[in-house]
């Protein structure tokens, strides 16, 4: 039986847990709504289940979802929850009017003035107190909006307060309009920096207010929505993202219009013939909130260096297609390529006129019938536009013309294509956020870097380091060490990998001149040293020497060049390979010895069995053994005769004891 204090402590902990957390069932009862409405409300308000510790989860049950009680109580008086309750009351009135056949009341209830509607303005202000917080969520928002923009609606409805399990016409039209506004802003502000074509769709990156925003536009093709997906969850996110992007785009467009007006005013004052767009557009794209007077100076310098690198990146992209005119063939998705061309300062022609066009984008093995090829035009494939954007330079059209085999299309998000400071900083940030990305540099990237900078020489042109990383990946380690099973292997998490990759900073250790001890303690230490019963403390001179040696090694490692580091890594890998080879050889020897022992045991056992059978056959031939009456065994003839003679005299022959099975074991086992 538990002690009174222990029982009281358990009771206090249980009561405290009940006050802090609520289950999903308790939350729905408190809010007086169904589970579907509760989930939709949590999505709109940004309330998510909490992950408990293992002990708490074990006590409460593994299948339960827990929410913070203060967040659920905060939802009780929320205006969206009130509107949901109002809508439930309105539904009851509509059903009653339909049942009683009151057409006038039903028409009045279904009018837009009476039907309840909820607003997400206050919710967006609560979730995003600063504009930069909303910018950081634009990537998920635009990816989902672009996905639903090309899906066909299945329900005709303009309101979103009711729960729909398919895309409505109102949300579809809003998504298409939002995509059009977003692409128009990206093209006008010239903030597009990267693009990539993958099997999932088109990946883009833009720099907006000092933040890198990446979004995905899917390929537009005939689709079928997969079953088993709760679409009301996705539509709740879509509704919130549409309302959020309305605020974000209003702010961005107003800032862009203000900057353009200021630029025109300065042009009129100074009488400039050409606007210096960099002074305004880059500042508008990279305007970051004030870091505050209380922040550290290091963070301020880091933000300034990051801003300068992003500004250099935007300046290179903005004038990329300046003075060039592109004609896009009808088989090429014009929306995506027009976005890149306009964002990079180019112009898209609507008619195929030879005097104005410089480049024609065609995705066919030959020109369409009726087209005449002109010498002053370059007929390129669509990948050329993306590769020029990622390289920030007009690449040679060799290899991109019609009918030619295209070079590899490299993703600019995991590899620094230009090898510039801004690209390297962006890739390092991506690797920091996603540690599992392999830093392999393809040969095509080395070619582009050579075109940009003729004096460029690759550190690892053959990709030996990446090959070694692939050899010593998680899957290959199982091959190198056969004794290790899949159950024994535990993969590290992202935080553990980031912690392991941190370089430990050098810390100065204080070495005391003389260690002062009491007389008794000093006498004990002296005796223990003489008797060699303890590890005596290191001498001060030896400690200083070791400390200086470690510090010199750390300084040498931090100051080594990439070539020296590569050579050191290669030598370490070779040493590790030798150790692994030696271990594999030992394992192979043990396996061979075990196999030889097994084979020899089988062979010897077979020979012994054959000798036993031969002896039995010989004894049967000589008459020493004969079959039993049932014919299933053999009987010793001499032993049977002795037993018969003893029975005739009225005596009983002693039976031989059975063999002891433990006799062959060691004595300590017996």
Curated annotation (Swiss-Prot):
<dbReference type="GO" id="GO:0070545">
    <property type="term" value="C:PeBoW complex"/>
</dbReference>
<dbReference type="GO" id="GO:0043021">
    <property type="term" value="F:ribonucleoprotein complex binding"/>
</dbReference>
<feature type="coiled-coil region">
    <location>
        <begin position="292"/>
        <end position="321"/>
    </location>
</feature>
<protein>
    <recommendedName>
        <fullName>Pescadillo homolog</fullName>
    </recommendedName>
</protein>
<keyword id="KW-0690">Ribosome biogenesis</keyword>
<dbReference type="GO" id="GO:0003723">
    <property type="term" value="F:RNA binding"/>
</dbReference>
<dbReference type="GO" id="GO:0005654">
    <property type="term" value="C:nucleoplasm"/>
</dbReference>
<dbReference type="GO" id="GO:0000463">
    <property type="term" value="P:maturation of LSU-rRNA from tricistronic rRNA transcript (SSU-rRNA, 5.8S rRNA, LSU-rRNA)"/>
</dbReference>
<keyword id="KW-0175">Coiled coil</keyword>
<comment type="similarity">
    <text>Belongs to the pescadillo family.</text>
</comment>
<dbReference type="Pfam" id="PF06732">
    <property type="entry name" value="Pescadillo_N"/>
</dbReference>
<comment type="function">
    <text>Required for maturation of ribosomal RNAs and formation of the large ribosomal subunit.</text>
</comment>
<dbReference type="GO" id="GO:0030687">
    <property type="term" value="C:preribosome, large subunit precursor"/>
</dbReference>
<dbReference type="InterPro" id="IPR010613">
    <property type="entry name" value="PES"/>
</dbReference>
<keyword id="KW-0698">rRNA processing</keyword>
<dbReference type="GO" id="GO:0000466">
    <property type="term" value="P:maturation of 5.8S rRNA from tricistronic rRNA transcript (SSU-rRNA, 5.8S rRNA, LSU-rRNA)"/>
</dbReference>
<feature type="region of interest" description="Disordered">
    <location>
        <begin position="643"/>
        <end position="670"/>
    </location>
</feature>
<dbReference type="InterPro" id="IPR036420">
    <property type="entry name" value="BRCT_dom_sf"/>
</dbReference>
<keyword id="KW-0539">Nucleus</keyword>
<feature type="compositionally biased region" description="Basic and acidic residues">
    <location>
        <begin position="644"/>
        <end position="662"/>
    </location>
</feature>
<feature type="domain" description="BRCT">
    <location>
        <begin position="316"/>
        <end position="402"/>
    </location>
</feature>
<dbReference type="Pfam" id="PF16589">
    <property type="entry name" value="BRCT_2"/>
</dbReference>
<dbReference type="InterPro" id="IPR001357">
    <property type="entry name" value="BRCT_dom"/>
</dbReference>
């Amino acid at each position: 039986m538990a002690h009174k204090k222990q029982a009281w402590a358990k009771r206090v902990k249980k009561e405290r847990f009940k006050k802090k957390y609520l289950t999903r069932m308790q939350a729905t009862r408190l809010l007086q709504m169904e589970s579907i409405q509760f989930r939709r409300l949590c999505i709109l308000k940004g309330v998510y289940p909490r992950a408990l510790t293992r002990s708490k989860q074990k006590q409460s049950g593994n299948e339960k979802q827990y929410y913070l009680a203060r967040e659920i109580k905060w939802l009780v008086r929320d205006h969206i929850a009130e509107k949901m309750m109002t809508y439930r009351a309105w539904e009851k009135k509509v059903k009653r009017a339909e049942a009683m056949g009151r057409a006038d009341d039903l028409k009045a209830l279904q009018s837009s003035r009476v039907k309840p509607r909820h607003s997400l303005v206050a919710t967006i202000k609560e979730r995003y107190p600063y504009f930069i917080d909303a910018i950081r969520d634009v990537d998920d928002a635009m990816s989902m909006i672009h996905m639903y923009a090309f899906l066909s609606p299945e329900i005709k409805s303009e309101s979103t307060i009711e729960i729909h399990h398919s895309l409505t016409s109102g949300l579809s039209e809003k998504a298409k309009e939002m995509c059009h506004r977003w692409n128009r802003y990206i093209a006008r502000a010239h903030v597009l920096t990267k693009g990539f074509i993958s099997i999932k769709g088109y990946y883009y990156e833009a720099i907006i207010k000092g933040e890198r925003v990446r979004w995905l536009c899917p390929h537009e093709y005939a689709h079928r929505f997969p079953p088993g997906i709760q679409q009301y969850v996705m539509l709740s996110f879509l509704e919130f993202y549409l309302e959020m992007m309305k605020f974000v785009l209003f702010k961005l467009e107003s800032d862009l219009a203000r900057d353009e007006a200021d630029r025109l005013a300065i042009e009129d004052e100074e009488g400039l013939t050409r606007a210096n767009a960099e002074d305004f557009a880059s500042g508008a794209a990279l305007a970051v909130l004030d870091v505050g007077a209380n922040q550290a100076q290091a963070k301020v310098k880091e933000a300034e260096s990051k801003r300068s690198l992003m500004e250099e990146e935007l300046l290179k992209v903005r004038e990329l297609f300046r003075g060039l005119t592109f004609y896009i063939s009808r088989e090429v998705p014009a929306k995506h390529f027009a976005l890149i061309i306009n964002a990079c300062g180019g112009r898209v022609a609507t008619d195929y006129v030879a005097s104005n066009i410089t480049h024609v984008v065609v995705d066919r093995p030959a020109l369409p019938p009726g087209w005449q090829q002109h010498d002053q035009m370059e007929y390129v494939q669509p990948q050329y536009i993306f590769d020029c954007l990622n390289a920030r330079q007009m690449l040679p059209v060799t290899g991109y013309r019609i009918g030619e085999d295209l070079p590899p299309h490299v993703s600019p998000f995991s590899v620094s294509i230009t090898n510039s400071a801004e690209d390297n900083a962006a890739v390092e940030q991506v690797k920091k956020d996603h540690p599992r990305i392999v830093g392999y540099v393809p040969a095509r990237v080395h070619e582009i870097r050579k075109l940009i900078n003729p004096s460029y020489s690759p550190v690892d042109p053959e990709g030996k380091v990446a090959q070694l990383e692939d050899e010593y990946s998680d899957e290959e380690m199982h091959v190198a060490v056969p004794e290790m099973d899949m159950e024994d292997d535990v993969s590290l998490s992202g935080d553990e990998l980031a912690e392991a990759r941190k370089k430990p900073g050098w810390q100065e250790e204080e070495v005391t001149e003389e260690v002062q001890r009491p007389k008794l303690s000093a006498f004990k230490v002296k005796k223990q040293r003489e008797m060699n019963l303890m590890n005596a403390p290191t001498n001060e001179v030896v400690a200083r020497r070791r400390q200086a040696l470690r510090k010199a090694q750390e300084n040498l490692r931090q100051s080594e060049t990439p070539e020296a580091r590569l050579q050191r890594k290669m030598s370490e890998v070779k040493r590790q390979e030798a150790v692994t080879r030696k271990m594999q050889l030992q394992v192979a020897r043990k396996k061979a010895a075990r196999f030889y022992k097994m084979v020899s045991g089988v062979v010897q056992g077979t020979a012994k069995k054959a000798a036993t059978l031969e002896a039995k056959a010989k004894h049967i031939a000589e008459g020493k053994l004969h079959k039993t009456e049932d014919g299933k065994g053999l009987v010793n003839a001499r032993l049977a005769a002795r037993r018969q003679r003893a029975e005739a005299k009225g005596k009983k022959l002693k039976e031989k004891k059975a063999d002891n099975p433990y006799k062959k074991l060691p004595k300590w086992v017996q």
